[in-house]
Swiss-Prot record:
It catalyses: Hydrolysis of proteins with trypsin-like specificity. The active site is at H147, D177, S255. InterPro entries: Pept_S1_alpha_lytic (IPR004236), Pept_S1A_streptogrisin (IPR001316), Peptidase_S1_PA (IPR009003), Peptidase_S1_PA_chymotrypsin (IPR043504), Trypsin_dom (IPR001254), TRYPSIN_HIS (IPR018114), TRYPSIN_SER (IPR033116). Disulfide bonds join C128-C148, C249-C276. The gene is sprB. Residues 1-38 form the signal peptide. This is Streptogrisin-B. GO terms for biological process: proteolysis. Belongs to the peptidase S1 family. One of its GO terms (molecular function) is serine-type endopeptidase activity. The keyword S-adenosyl-L-methionine does not apply. Residues 39-114 form a propeptide. The keyword Disulfide bond applies. It comes from Streptomyces griseus.
């Protein structure tokens, strides 16, 4: 049974998030979408782009992610290797009169939730990565991905599941992708660091920001933010909104791990495609939203 917070977005809220200003898409191979007039490119209004976004959501094709590019005034739809030409045509058909607003791009690999401070944490459902240690007064918690805490109750520090860390006290997935675990083991060190990097504050991502990710599978990798407020359809009804898109690689087991920029906490690893041998696209839950939802802070 899934544990969910009661803060799921309404359709109206989703539309607001979708129409937020976005930019900086990663370089991926494009599938050309013909325009009505190639010599004079059309421009599309915010309402048309929102309608196109709703149409892509309604098409419900797993392995897709989309966000608005304010420079070209197009809805950029990224499709992974599992999406067929027929499904791409289905997306275009769903967009109807706004199909010309779509720019469809192909990325290698498959979008997946990456379940299997970066340190490994274990539940009855698998292994994830600890995001950031946080606190509210004298009570200590850690943040991780919501698809990790969804359905998980107790968390351990080792694969043998003999050293208890704590219990899930909140989870928000799908729609969002964050969860919080309250420490119940008072003997566990609760450093406010990620590896050797001290984390002193939290910040919102910006396009082009240099960022670093740490995870229990692949360790530490760096890259940059390529877009904001992306929607990702992982399949099976698991759609998340408002994600940070990056060109930082990640692999299964890295889920929930921290994304940071210097001393600032930025996000929690959600999912993506590719791997750390060939590269890939990875999406992150903004950490400021989770901190606000649970009334906690980094330290």
């Amino acid at each position: 049974m899934r544990i969910k917070r009661t803060s799921n977005r309404s359709n109206a809220a989703r539309r607001v998030r979708t129409t937020a200003v976005l930019a900086g898409l990663a370089a991926v191979a494009a599938l050309a979408v013909p325009t009505a007039n190639a010599e004079t490119p059309r421009t599309f209004s915010a309402n048309q782009l929102t309608a196109a976004s709703d149409a892509v959501l309604g098409a419900d094709i797993a392995g897709t992610a989309w966000n608005i590019d304010p420079q070209s005034k197009r809805l950029v739809v990224t499709v992974d290797s599992t999406v067929s030409k027929a499904e791409i045509n289905q997306i275009k058909k769903s967009a109807g009169a706004n199909a010309d607003a779509l720019r469809i791009e192909r990325t290698p690999g498959k979008f997946t939730k990456l379940i299997s401070g970066g340190d490994a944490i274990y539940s009855s459902t698998g292994r994830c990565s600890l995001g950031f240690n946080v606190r509210s007064g004298s009570t200590y918690y850690f943040l991780t991905a919501g698809h990790c805490t969804d359905g998980a109750t107790t968390w351990w520090a080792n694969s043998a599941r003999t050293t208890v860390l704590g219990t899930t006290s909140g989870s928000s997935f799908p729609n969002n992708d964050y969860g919080i675990v309250r420490y119940t083991n008072t003997t566990i060190p609760k450093d406010g660091t990620v590896g050797g990097q001290d984390i002193t504050s939290a910040a919102n991502a910006t396009v082009g920001m240099a960022v670093t990710r740490r995870g229990s599978t692949t360790g530490t990798h760096s890259g940059s933010v390529t877009a904001l407020n992306a929607t990702v359809n992982y399949g099976g009804g698991d759609v998340v909104y408002g994600m940070i898109r990056t060109n930082v690689c990640a692999e299964p087991g890295d889920s929930g791990g921290p994304l940071y920029s210097g001393t600032r906490a930025i996000g929690l690893t959600s999912g993506g495609s590719g791997n750390c041998s060939s590269g890939g696209t990875t999406f992150f839950q903004p950490v400021t939203e989770a901190l606000s939802a649970y009334g906690v802070s980094v330290y």
